[in-house]
Every structure is written in structure tokens, then in C-alpha cells.
UniProtKB/Swiss-Prot annotation:
Binding partners and assembly: Interacts with SEPTIN2; this interaction impedes tubulin-binding. Interacts with TRAF3IP1. Interacts with KNSTRN.
GO CC aspect terms: axon; axoneme; microtubule; microtubule organizing center; mitotic spindle; neuron projection; postsynaptic density
Name under which the protein is recorded: Microtubule-associated protein 4
Localization per Swiss-Prot or TrEMBL: Cytoplasm, Cytoskeleton; Cytoplasm, Cytoskeleton, Microtubule organizing center
Sequence ranges of Polar residues compositional bias: 537-547, 677-707, 826-846, 1047-1057
BP GO terms, sorted: cell division; cilium disassembly; establishment of spindle orientation; microtubule cytoskeleton organization; microtubule polymerization; microtubule sliding; mitotic spindle organization; negative regulation of non-motile cilium assembly
Residues annotated with Phosphoserine modification: 5, 60, 99, 254, 257, 417, 509, 515, 520, 522, 599, 618, 668, 685, 695, 761, 799, 801, 827, 902, 915, 978, 1050, 1056
Gene name, Swiss-Prot/TrEMBL: Map4
Annotated Low complexity bias: 262-272, 729-742, 785-812, 847-857, 1010-1036
MF terms (GO), sorted A to Z: microtubule binding; microtubule stabilizing activity
Entry PTM: Phosphorylation on Ser-761 negatively regulates MAP4 activity to promote microtubule assembly. Phosphorylated at serine residues in K-X-G-S motifs by MAP/microtubule affinity-regulating kinase (MARK1 or MARK2), causing detachment from microtubules, and their disassembly.
UniProt Tau/MAP repeat ranges: 897-927, 928-958, 959-990
Phosphothreonine modified-residue sites: 419, 450, 497, 506, 546, 659, 916
Amino acid sequence: MADLSLVDALTEPPPEIEGEIKRDFMAALEAEPYDDIVGETVEKTEFIPLLDGDEKSGNSESKRKPCVDTSQVEDIPSSKPTLLANGDHGVEGNNTTGSPTDFLVENVDYEDYQNSQSWPEDASFCFQPQQVLDTNQADPFNVHHDDGLADLLFVSSGPTNASAFIEENNPLEDSYGVLPCDSFAPTAVVSQEWSVGAPDSPHSEPCVSPEVTIETAQPATELSKAVDLESVKEQLPAKALEMMAGQTTDAVPSKESEGSPDTDAAPGPDTDVTLTKDIEESSSPDVISANVTQPFTESDMFLTQEMELLIGTEAAQVKDTMSSVEPDISSAKNTAPPTEEETVPGKDMTFPKEAETALPIEMDLAPPEDVALPKETELELAPAAGTAPLSETEVALAKDEEPSTGIPAAQEMLLSSETEVVLPSDSIMTLTKEVTVPLEAAGPLVSDMTAILETEMTLGGGTATPTETKLGKVKDMAPLPESEVALGKDVVTLPETKVTEFNNVTPLSEEEVASIKDVSPSPETETAKNADLHSGTELTLDNSMTPPSDPALPLETKVATVQIKDKETVQTQEELSEDSQLESVQLEGQSAVPPCTISPEPVKAADQKSTLPVDEGSPLEKLEQKETSGSQPPELCSGVSRQEEGKAAVGLTGNDIATPPNKELPPSPEKKAKPLATTQPAKTSTSKAKIQPTSLPKQPAPTTSGGLNKKPMSLASGSVPAAPHKRPAAATATARPSTLPARDLKPKPITETKVAEKRTSPSKPSSAPALRPGPKTTPTISKATSPSTLVSTGSSSRSPSTTLPKRPTTTKTEGKPADVKRMTAKSATADLSRSKTTSASSVKRNTTPTGATPPAGMASTRVKPMSAPCRSSVALSVDKKPTSTKPSSSAPRVSRLATTVSAPDLKSVRSKVGSTENMKHQPGGGRVQIQNKKVDISKVSSKCGSKANIKHKPGGGDVKIESQKLNFKEKAQAKVGSLDNVGHLPAGGTVKTEGGGSEAPPCPGPPAGEEPAIPEAAPDAGAPTSASGLSGHTTLSGGGDQREPQTLDSQIQETSI
């Protein structure tokens, strides 16, 4: 170790040395370099390339002492470059401060490199050393830094540094409050150590730095980032998760303790400096808009390219979708597409490397603002962007903290960022819109992502609530911005049905879309950030969620955003004088979200929609949508229905039909319009909605969303059509509508009642689709939704929707909410399976008529079909979501699936049957039977009593055969000492086989194993003819599909056995 010199480090590939060093450090460095190096600066210097010995030995001392120095170093651009330029030697002179400083400087360099924020020189300088470090191994420290940084970031160097560093880290932890470091693997420690060296973490810092860097808008720095990110991404993905967990936690403690100089004396200042830099950078609106926009475009393009490489099709799709929507927008938002694309790539990048993901993500966030800056008001937004970057930086920090601190920290950070954002929103509505919407999007995303991360429902639920509450506040603040709505709309569009949604949205209003897109990157970025924060794994979901937004995000972001989008779309549509369609769509949309928004007058809603929806509707609707998200069915129902409905507005029939699940998403805009249209009712319902969120669990008949929105008609027609359709589904769907209808019944006219019914119907189908993604985040959203709903004033219509989700349980039969749910899932599913097509067609048809027919006529006509079909769709959707696990039809599906899967199994069984030994070895379902049959030759008679019995068992049922199979399996697998033992297994085995359900097919095969005649039957077993030897098997042969699935089950069982 000590023998290694800077020259050696430079000469030899640092990674190899690091690899060796890792081993050495693991064993020796912890003891030797730690103590000796602390005393001897020379060894430290030598170890500096190793980073562990150097930085640890020096940093344990220095970091405590130099923590301030680190911040100072960060503050002093020259010192960092000097350190870099000096390399380890220059630092050696100042060993204690130098080494730590050096280490810190390297981190700072990396940080600056990423953060080039207020130090463009340092950034570029650092950037040169950084990139050059790879090429230039002149500075072993730098080289190590790059390699170690990337590796550290980090695979090869990370653990090595971690080893020595961990011991060092104990003091470091003391000084840095990085206690988690110990608990975290050396990798985490080293990563954080890097972070600490770089004031606590390049990761935590990078969160700021990416954003800052972007704001600094130094393409070179961005390029270096991209390069590092690329390498890091490669290394990071495997290690990213562990690193992320450790680093994030480590970084989080540092960040959390960042506030305390003790823990992160240097990191705090560094972060503060970074933030200050960001603020300063942001302070220069012109610089920001120019630098940010250009760098974003360039660096983001690079990142986007790299990230897109990762994202690939997704990014391309998003780009294409964005581009499609962007035709008009592209001019205003040339940089926005890269930003948005970058956002998606950022997400992808985020997945591989969360810490660094923060960089791209935050960069994405910054670019959206920056992009928005040019579009909105570069100067205005620039300062706002400065503020937002701070808040975003905090958000980034919060996100970094989030993994360790958990979503609450992120929420707190988000809250702070929101507060800051809100301030800008007060001063700058545009920024607020963008920022607020991103925050909201982030909130929902966080909720969704959180929900996904944890149990998607557990963590998301608890955490989502605060976030969404915050979101509620933001929404209240945000209600004014239409751009927010547009943003939400755009975001939703991307996530939901990228092409379809974009097309629909674009038709609605490209201007809106343009603004939306500009704003949209922020939410998307936030989404990426949130996704990143939550976890690499979660990030993947997040990607899916974010671009698709249907599975997970749709609940929150999609619904909330969709609501905004739909609202905006509705506004635009109305502006486009699509009032008629909108009215019909509104009817449909309102049907989709029956409780959501049934205003006394659809037309009125359409008219007011553009006015009020912006103020109340968008935020309130968002809240309600979130609330809906909280309620599983209604949430997505609302979101989906809204989007779909919005699509319907664009192409009422075509879009709705095209996207049956999303079909009802657009109702949210229309709902919004209507609740807003019924401003008084909306307000009333707002108060009610507020109450309703509180009573969300009981929202069955609270008439929370103002009696206006829901009507008995809605209830009656919704429940009656649905009820006949399918009692459970009808109960749930109808119950929701009925509850809301009861509320809305009061003020609404009959026409609106129809609309309500209609809305209710879409709402239910929507809720069903929502269930898929909804279940994860639904609980979380529910909690958060309540606060959000409370906050939202115009959430009346949405509140009902939100309420609806829970109402399904407490619907018509409040006494049997659970039963309703279950029944809805099962019988409703079964009924829905039948009415599935009908409901889809009906919904589509209804949607089409809605678009064509005025609210009143269409409402009544459509309401009935929609109510029943929609509900069926809802139940159906629910069924589908469980993967048709609930509906009886789903059972057939399962069997079919099993059959499809089992077919290969049968083949494999046959091939394996080739040898008795193989068959015995393969206890799998049918194979087991074959084995058993072979066993049967020797044992079957005792076990089954006789081959005839075996045949009879299949006749008796798959279970019987299964039991036999299991028994045989036991024999074949364990070759139970005695037939009695085998016989005993069947009791348990039978139960197991029951799950297999159709192991009889294997029995045919096993008989084949037993005797030539049976073997013949066995091959036939695949075909119905296998009955030749086994009558029972013949029957099974008839149900060959079942056999195969059963066989699979059997095989699985045996494997477990």
C-alpha cells in the first residue's frame, strides 16, 4: 500500500490498484494506514491515490478539523483547482487540511464538476481535471478521484475506501454524523465518504450540483457529468442500489446534520455554498436563462442522449410523443423537449444510479424551470428559478435524505421547497405554477413511488398524506395558474397514453400544450426525482409510472395532473368552442367521476369551466383526483376517466374508444368545469369535500361534494343499471354514484342527474382501471387525498370522486362495504367479464354519444348504458388489474394461461419421462404423476391401490389426481421410505394439488410411465385420446388445458416440496 506512489497510481490503471488496494485495505488499511497514515503524511500521500488511506487517514483527522476547510475550499474555487492542480502532492504539504482538503477538494471538484454552479472556472477546471483525470492520470489523486469517484460511486473504489474509511468513518461519523456509514456497507461509507469529503456527499451535493450545474449551464461541466454519469451509471447500477441506500442514508444523515456544522461542518457550508451558488446563479435571470437554457440544451442533450441510450425506446417514445404534442410547442420550447426527454432519461439514469440520478433529475428540474423561464419570463422565472432551484435543491437534498429519512424528510423538504416555491408563486405565479405543479406532481409521484417502494400502499399512504396535504396547500395556491393545469395536463399526457394523450391534448390546444410542456418537464423531473429518491428499483416503476403514469403515477400525478390537464383541456376545448362536446364529454366525464363533478348545468360548467376550473378546479380537482387516487377505484377512475374524457373532448368517441381504460380520464376536466361551473355548489361541496376527505372512509352518503353534484338519478340509474348488471360491481360502482348522487341530487336537475349517473358510470370504470395502479398508492393517496380535498375549494365534484373510491365499500350497502368490494371484485368481476365487452363498448358508445349528444339527452341515454357498462368496466378493470384473478372469467384465463404455460411443461415432462429416473427426479405436476406411475409399477398399486384407481382419481377430479401426483411426487422425489408415507403425503398433497387443480393430465403421463400401454396414453394425455388407459384422464384430456395448468401447479408444488 505504502509502496504505491503517485507515479505508480498514474502509471498503473487506478482501478486495478484500487482493486488490489481494496483487498489490502480491507485487511490491513483499516489498521495500518489509519493509524500510521494519520501520523505520516507521506504515507497518506501515497495512499491518497487509494483515497481510503489518504482521505481516511487524513480525513478522519482533517475531516473533523478541515470540515470547515472543506467548505472553505469549496468556497474558494482556486483552492480546489489548486488542490487538483497540485494533486496529492500539493495537498500533501497541507496533509491534515490538505489531505482532507484534497479529498474534500476532489469531492468538491467532483462536486464542482457536477456543481459547476457558481464556479464556472472551477467547474470547467475541475471538469478538465475530472475528465482529464481519467485521461490525465497525472494526479493520482485526481485519477483516483475519477476512478474512485466513478468506482466509488461506485463500485471498485467504494468498498475499498469504505473499509479503511469505515474505521476512519467512526470518527468521521462523529464529526459528520455519518453514523449510518458504519451501518451502511463500506461502499456506502466510501460513497458517503466521498460525499463527506465533498462535504458530506457528492450525492447529496450532486442533487444540488446537477441542478446548480444545469443552472450554471456549463455544457463542459455537463459533458463531464454526462461522461462521469455514464461511467458511474455503468458502475452504479449494480452498486447504485446498495450505494444509494447507504449513500442516501449516509448522505441523508449528513444532509440532515448538514444543518449542524458539527456533523457536516464542511458539507453544510458546501451545500450552503452550493445553494448560495445556485441562488447566485439563479439570481442572474439572464445568465440562468441563457446559460441554463443553452447548457440544458447542450448538456441536457448530452445527458439526454446518454440517458436516452438507457431509456432508448422510452425516451424516444416520450420524445416522439412530446414532439407530437410539441409541434407548436417546440418553437417556444426548443430546449424543453431535451429537458423533458432528459427528464425521462433522467428517470432512467436515476434508476441505475439514484445519487447521480438526483443530478440528472435535478438537472431536469432545473431545465424545466429554465426552459419555462425562456418561455414564461426568463427574468421573472430566473429569480423564481433561483428560488425554485433552492427549493429544488432542498428537494434534491430532501430526496437524498428521503431514502434514509424516508418520504417524510422528502416531504418536509418538499414542503420547504414548496414553501419557497409558493413564495415565488406568490411573487411569480408562473414559476409557482411550474414549481408548484412539479411539487404536486412530485408529491403524487412521491406518494405513488413511495407506495410502490414500500408496499406501494404502506409507505406511500403515510408519506403521501403529508405530501399531498402540502400539495393541497400548493394547489390552493396553484389554483390560479392555468399553466399549472396545462402542466398537469401535459405531464399526465406523457405518463398516461403518451401518444394518445398527447394527441388528445394537442388537439385540445397546442398553445396550452406548449405551456404545459414547458411546465411539464418540471413535474416530470420531479417525478424522476421522486422516483430516484425512492429507489433504483422504484425508479424503474417510476419510469413506468412517469412515462406511462397509468400504472402508478396515474393515481397521483396522472390523476392530479390529468385533472389539471383535463381541466385545462376542457378550458381550451371550451375556448375552442367545444362546449357541446365538452358538455357531452362532461356528462360522460362526470359520469366517469359520478361524485366528482356534476354541476347543475353542464353547459354552465363548460362556460365557467374555463374560468373557475383554473382557479379552483385545477388545484381542487387535483386534490380531488388525488383523493380519488386515495380511493383506489375513483382515483384512477377519475384520472383515467378524466384523461379519457379529455380525449373524448378532443375526439369524444374515437379517443374514448381508443383508450377504454383511460377513456374516462377526461371527465376530470369536465368535472372540473362543472364543479366550477357550479361554483356555489362547488364551494359548498368544497366545504363538504373538506369534510368528506375527513370522512373519506365513510364517504358513502355524506353528500360531501355538495348535494348538487350527485343526484338520486345518478344513484338510481347508476345503481339500478349497475345493480342489475352485477350486484357487487353495481353496488360498489352504484354505491359510489348513489352516495354522490344523493349529495348531488339536491341541487342538480334531472339532466344533470343523468349526467351524474353517467359520470358515475365512467367513474367506476375509471376506478377499476385505477385499481391496478391505484391499489399501490391508493391508500397513500387516500390519506393525502383527504387533506388535499380539504384544501381544495372547488374539489366538490372531485371530492365526491375521491369519496367514491371509498364509497364503493360503503356504497349502497354501507352495511356490507367489504362485501360490496369483494363481491364487486368477484361477482362484479364475473358480471363485468360478461359486460366487459358490453361495458367497454357501451362506455365507448356512450362516450361517442356523449361527444355528439348534448349533456341532457346524452346524459340520460348514456347514463344508463354508462352506469351499467362503466361499472362493469370498473369491475372488469379491477378484475383485469388483479390479472383476472377475481372474476370467474379470470379463472378461465388463469387456466388458459396455465394451459399455455403447462403445454411446455407437458412437453418437457414427456422428454424427461424418457427415463424413469428423470421422471422421478422431476416431481413437477404431471411429471410427478409419470414418476408416480413409474413408481406405481412398483408402488402405485399400493398407493393408488390400482391403476384403475389412478384413472378413477382423475375422474374423481383433478384434486384426486393431484393428490396422487403429490403422493407419487413424494415417492419420486423423496422416494418416501414406504408407500404409507407416500400415502400420507397425499392428504397434504391433495390440498396442494388442489391448487394445481389439474394434475390429472400428469397422471395420464405417469400411467404411461407405469406401463407401455399407459405410456401410450401418456403421450395421448396431451390429447383427449389419452383416456385410452385412463378414463379419468380422458376427461382431463378433454380439459387438457386444465391438465397443463394443473401440471404446472403440481410441478411447482413438488419443487417446493
